[in-house]
Structure formats: C-alpha cells, structure tokens
Amino acid sequence: MPYIGSLKVNQFRNLADVDITPHSQFNFFFGQNGAGKTSILESIYYLSVGRSFRTHLPQRLIQDNTDRFLIFITLYNGTQFIPLGVERDCHGDRCLRINGETASSWSLAAKRLPLCSLSAMSHRFLLDGPRVRRQFLDWLMFHVEPSFFSIWQRLQRSLKQRNAALKAKLPLGEITHWDKMLVEDGERLHQLRQNVVTEFRPLFTQMLQQFLPAYPLIGHYFRGWSEKYSLMEQLQINLKQDLQRGYTQAGPQRADFRLTLRDLPAQDILSQGQQKLVTYALHFAQGLLLKEKTGISPIYLIDDLPAELDANKRDCVIDLVNYLESQVFISGIDPNEIRLPPHSTLFHVKHGKVAAL
C-alpha cells in the first residue's frame, strides 16, 4: 500500500517550516481552530492534484511576506521510497518533481498518490451540480482503467473544438467535423463509466449499511444524452439548439450519478448530517473498489472528524480505514474524541508548528 514516509512543508498558508514523519497508518493532528491542522491535509492534497480543496486562488496558499511555498514527501510505493515535491511562486510558476525528474503532467502525481478527501463540505456531493459527481466516477476510472485518461483527454479536445466552432457560428461542415471523434470517445467513456458504476453499487450498499442502515439509497447513472438515441443521433437532433446556445448540450460531459431514496432525490429527504454520512459511505466504497481492482488503497484525508460524526460513526471510520489498510490523516480539536488504534501517531499543531507526541 502507498504511504507517505516523510512530509516537509515550507511557507504554505501558516505552516512556515514543517518536517514530520507520519505513521504508515493512523495520523491525528489536533489543535485549536486556525492552528494549521487543515493546512497539513491541504498541502498533501495540493501535491497530488495541483489545486486546493479550500480555495480557487492559489496565491492565498503562499504564506504572507514570502514569495513561494514548497511541499515535499517521500512516498513508499510498495517496493521503495520515492521523492515527490512541488514548488510554486507568487508569479504562478510551479515545478513538480517526481523521483528527481521534472514531471510533465500532474496526472503522474495523482496516479502515484491516490487520495480520498473528506471535509466539512463533503455533503455538497448531493447538493452541487453533476460535475462533482462525474469527477467522483472519473477518479475511480483514472485509477482502475488504463485507457481512461487518454480517452478523456481526446474527448476534451474534440469537445473544445466543437464548442469553439459553435460559438463562432462556423459553417456546419466545420462543426460536424468533430462529431465522429466526439462520438467515438464519448461512447467509450460512457461504457467505462457504466462498468465502474455496476461494480461500485454493491460496495456502496455495503458501506452504507455501516453508516445509515435504515436508508437503502440507490445510485442511478445518467450518461448525458437520451436513451432513445445514439450519441451521433443526439448531436444531429440538437445541432440547431447547439448553434443558438454556442455549446454542445449532449454528451458524456453532461453525465451524472444521482442517489435516490424511495424514488425521491436523496438530498430532499436526508438531513445535512445524514448527507455527510452518505458521502463517507461513497468514499469508503471508492477506496474498497480501488483496492479490489488494483490491490492499492488510497490515502484518506479527513478534516475535523470529531465535529462531523458521533462517537459510534467515528469508530466505524477508524475500523474501515483499518480494514482497507489505508494511511489516514485526520484533524480535530480534541484527541480524546478519537479512539486511536495502537498503530498511530498523534501530532499537536499550534501557530503553524507541528510536533509529534
């Protein structure tokens, strides 16, 4: 299983100079609000995917009165430790290095460092638009389907070109020129998503029993165009409206994965607390499927766990992480609110300084 063997963070948010050796399984960071606990988790997340889960403004990640931040880890990949690090300056320039080499794509870091992140906003999975749910499915496919990323990249290129042609109101031949490529990759992407949903559903049901046994939610996958037509037929039917609107209305870029309870949208029935529990079940099912398909468990980042769940559900989270054999980074205010297993390390965070206890 991959795990982070060392973590160094410099000038990231309020973390001036952090150098710690995490445990290969459980790591709990405690301290008062604003101490820097969430920033530890955020730095790991940034290194994996190249963005923050808290802000869309990367300039805010650089510590005040400094001009750059640095995040560096050694990552155990099952056979050896490899170095992985990123530096970003105030001008927006950034450099990602993996095993001593400059990486050409952030997907290389994401592949080596698979993460599942859970935070106070996790319940937005049900409330936000389809994009966040597509990303959830695509994360799984990225890690379990070798062909996914190249298909997804080609689809994005052809979709971008078709939308540009629609917006510019180019001749029909220049617009439909992109249809064949879009359809080929769109149908392939749909099939991959459909397959992964089929494998995911029973695992989600299994995990949901741990958190909300009285709520048998059902996951429904919508491919992004009518079941009555092929994608090519749908593009032809929609062409006039696409021209009016300046973008492609149908296709896998409109797919969704919705949860229902007794044929009603889950978000219309469940409380906010229950929605958070559903999100936990989703992400643990995600980790379980990844482990079944690849033998690899993701690293979990769980922000403010005690505030999110009651004692029984917190124990359930600990047991599931233990079952998955995942490394986990958990934050909270009071360490006594977590039943930490023997194989764990406790870190105190105060004013941006982190110390192992």
UniProtKB/Swiss-Prot annotation:
PANTHER family per record: DNA REPLICATION AND REPAIR PROTEIN RECF
GO molecular-function terms, A-Z: ATP binding; single-stranded DNA binding
Name of the protein described by the UniProt record: DNA replication and repair protein RecF
Organism: Coxiella burnetii (strain Dugway 5J108-111)
Keywords: ATP-binding, Cytoplasm, DNA damage, DNA repair, DNA replication, DNA-binding, Nucleotide-binding, SOS response
InterPro entries in the cross-refs: DNA-binding_RecF, DNA-binding_RecF_CS, P-loop_NTPase, RecF/RecN/SMC_N, RecF_2
Sections of the chain in a coiled coil: none
One annotated GO biological process: SOS response
Similarity remark: Belongs to the RecF family.
Pfam families in the cross-refs: SMC_N
PROSITE patterns the UniProt entry points to: RECF_1 (PS00617), RECF_2 (PS00618)
Free-text function comment from the UniProt entry: The RecF protein is involved in DNA metabolism; it is required for DNA replication and normal SOS inducibility. RecF binds preferentially to single-stranded, linear DNA. It also seems to bind ATP.
Subcellular location, record wording: Cytoplasm
An example Gene Ontology CC term for this record: cytoplasm
Amino acids binding ATP: 31-38
SUPFAM superfamilies: P-loop containing nucleoside triphosphate hydrolases
Main location: cytoplasm
